[in-house]
């Protein structure tokens, strides 16, 4: 599998996890926006960057955060759990990178409205 195919496959894994919990999702094809996935549930919008291994540059992070704030959406990063070959973890972006504060938090299923 090419890196593109692996990334696309993980985007679909993320979408399946969200749809199983009642989210309506749409994938942004060919990375034309800073968000890979748009998800909505109970009137709340979530923009998601699906990163198989969680790697994201500071510039991409900050651009994604600004994009979400402008749209009124919750900025989320999904990644594969460390050392695992399956599953999805969700992280809420809290701050810009380099602010001296922890810029993310791991979301439990309850935090993300998944139960």
Where are these regions (language model features)?
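Domain-level recognition of nuclease-like catalytic cores that cleave nucleotide substrates
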Residues: 5, 72-115
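Short coil/turn segments at beta-strand junctions that form active-site/ligand-binding loops
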Residues: 23, 44, 73-74
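Acidic-basic catalytic patches of nuclease active cores, encompassing PD-(D/E)XK
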Residues: 1-28
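Conserved catalytic cores of phosphodiester-cleaving nucleases, focusing on short active-site segments
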Residues: 18, 37-54
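Short beta-strand scaffold segments in enzyme catalytic cores
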Residues: 36-37, 77
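Active-site-adjacent loop/helix micro-motif of nuclease/hydrolase catalytic cores
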Residues: 29, 54-65
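Alpha-helical scaffold elements within enzyme catalytic domains, especially in hydrolases
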Residues: 17, 66-67
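Short acidic/glycine-enriched loop/turn segments that link adjacent beta-strands
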Residues: 31-34
């Amino acid at each position: 599998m090419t890196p593109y195919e692996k990334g696309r496959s993980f985007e679909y894994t993320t979408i399946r996890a969200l749809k199983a919990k009642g989210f309506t999702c749409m994938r942004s094809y060919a990375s034309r926006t800073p968000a890979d996935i748009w998800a909505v549930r109970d009137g709340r919008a979530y923009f998601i960057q699906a990163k198989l291994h969680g790697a994201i540059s500071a510039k991409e992070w900050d651009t994604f955060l600004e994009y979400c704030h402008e749209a009124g959406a919750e900025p989320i990063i999904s990644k594969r759990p460390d050392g695992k070959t399956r599953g999805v973890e969700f992280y809420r972006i809290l701050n810009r990178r380099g602010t001296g504060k922890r810029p993310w938090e791991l979301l439990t299923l309850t935090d993300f409205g998944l139960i």
